[in-house]
Every structure is written in C-alpha cells, then in structure tokens.
Regions:
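Sequence/fold signature of self-assembling virion shell proteins
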Residues: 2-27, 31-50, 62-81, 91, ...
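Residue-level signal for threonine
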Residues: 85, 162, 269
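Extended, solvent-exposed, turn-rich assembly/linker loops in the middle of proteins
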Residues: 122-199
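Alpha-helical scaffold segments that mediate packing/assembly in large oligomeric complexes
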Residues: 86-153, 275-284
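Short Gly/aromatic-enriched secondary-structure transition segments
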Residues: 55-63
Length: 284
C-alpha cells in the first residue's frame, strides 16, 4: 500500500502568453471616425510649391489654383471569433471566457498595426539595403530626406524601429547624450524605448521611438523600419470603434467572444515616409 498520495494543484489565474495585445501605432497617424459608408477621404492641400509672382505686363496679378489631393481609404470588416463548448469551459484551467475576450481584442489590435505598417512599407523614399548595418548616420540620412521634402521635424515624427535597430542605437554615445534626449535612458518604465505592449512615450532626437515586434523582415538581413510624420498616414475606423461582444448559446451549450471592427489605412503623403532596410540577423 502506498504511503503517499500526491496532489496536483492547478493555478486558476491564467498567465498571458507573450504576444502583442495593444495597438502601438494608431496614435501615431492621422485618424478619422466614419459615421457611415465604406470609404473615408483624406484631403491633402498645399500650394504645389508655388512661388510669389509680380504683376503682369497687363497690370493683373497672375492667379493660380491650390494643389488638392483626395486620398480614399477603403474600409473593410475585420473579425476574430472564439468559441468554446460549455464542457471545455467547465473542465479547463483558468477563466476561459476572460481568455477569449483578451485574445480576440489582441487579434484586432494587431490588425490595426498591420494595416498601418503595410501602408508605410509602400513608401518609395528608401534608405539602406540588405546587409546594411543600422547606424546613427543612417537615421540622420532619413531625417535629412524628410527635411529636404519640407516635412516639419516637430512632435509628430515617429521612428518605428525593429528591435535590432534600437539595439544598435543604444550602443552609441548619441543615444544617451543630453543633446538628443529629454529623459535619462533606462530610468524607470517611462525611460525605456524597448517594447512594452502599450503606446510608447520615449523620445530621441525629438521623435517618438516605437520599437515593434511585428515589422516586415524581422530577424533577417532585410529588416524594415520607418521614419514618418503623423500626417503621412491615415487610419479610418467606424465611430463605434472596436466591438467586443460575448455571449452564450443555450441550444448548443457554447460560449463565444468576438471582436469586430470596420477600418482601413491609407498612405497620404509619400514624401513623409522614409523606409529603412537594414540587417538585423546578428541579433535574431
């Protein structure tokens, strides 16, 4: 007869797996709330680079038209639906209904960032190539390209970076130089540029640094990072925002959770986006 009877205890509070749950990018672009319809039109207006003129020989001042560009953002419907039977909810460890709600919301938030990243990746102002090592000089090249295109270097600039590019920057003296930063690097939660699954607040060289775990080419010799102005990208979403209903089907005895949203993104000003291609394989 055994003299011990071991017991196994299962922790009821679940531990969230490592994945992105929040959108990091929607606050960095121009947003629009759509009341009704499947399209949102963003108007970009400028003078077209016009120069001042003098009065003509006929005594009249030459007139011109403004440069007005309407950019159409097409909204699509996006969903994520999780369903579990009553027995699975009853027999499984942890709060399965809470897990369903958490994961569906995360899926839609990742889709928001994916839409914005796809539009950024369509920019034609490019720097670097496969095998290019990330440097401060490369970043400054991007800054100059924006300045040459008359993009204001104001509080609306974002550097959306691969983890490896940030790793290279952090090894440079410029990263912690007081001339570049307005807070001490690594000083508490607000003093880090590393990804924290929530909107970033760290600024370097007067631009918002956003390290993102889901950018194109991650871990390869052709990683993509982006330097852009807020008005270069638009993102439209229905006024109701993200719907996250939950429910229970009595006839079939299953619980469900759904996240749904009508949304889309659009590149508005190509000159306001610089695409970096660099080698991050050494840190993959």
């Amino acid at each position: 007869m055994a003299d011990t009877a071991f017991q196994t205890q299962y922790r009821q509070e679940f531990i969230a797996g490592f994945e992105q749950h929040q959108s990091l990018l929607r606050e960095t672009v121009t947003t629009e709330a759509v009341i009704k319809g499947n399209q949102a039109v963003f108007l970009v207006a400028d003078s077209g680079g016009a120069a001042a003129v003098t009065r003509g020989v006929n005594g009249l001042i030459p007139a011109r038209a403004d440069n007005l560009t309407q950019n159409t953002c097409v909204l699509g419907e996006w969903h994520d639906l999780v369903r579990k039977t009553g027995f699975n909810v009853f027999a499984s460890q942890g709060s399965q209904r809470q897990i369903m709600q958490m994961t569906t919301t995360a899926v839609l938030n990742r889709k928001v960032d994916s839409q914005i990243t796809t539009e950024l990746n369509g920019g034609t102002v490019t720097i670097g190539a496969a095998g290019t090592i990330p440097t401060v000089s490369l970043f400054q090249n991007g800054r100059v390209k924006l300045s040459n295109a008359s993009v204001p270097w104001d509080s609306n600039i974002t550097f959306l970076t691969q983890p490896s590019y940030l790793a290279y920057l952090e090894q440079t003296p410029e990263f912690s130089n007081a001339q570049y930063v307005d807070m001490r690097p690594y000083n508490g939660d607000g003093g880090t540029a590393s990804w924290r699954d929530k909107p970033q607040a760290y600024r370097w060289r007067n631009c918002l640094l956003v390290e993102h775990p889901n950018l194109p080419g991650k871990g390869t010799t052709s990683e993509k990072s982006f330097l852009f102005h807020k008005t270069a990208i638009g993102h439209a979403m229905d006024t109701g925002g993200m719907a996250t209903p939950v429910g229970y089907n009595e006839e079939q005895d299953y619980s469900w959770a759904r996240a749904s949203c009508f949304m889309g993104a659009k590149l508005l000003q190509n000159s306001g986006v610089v695409v970096f291609t660099t080698d991050g394989s050494a840190y993959a």
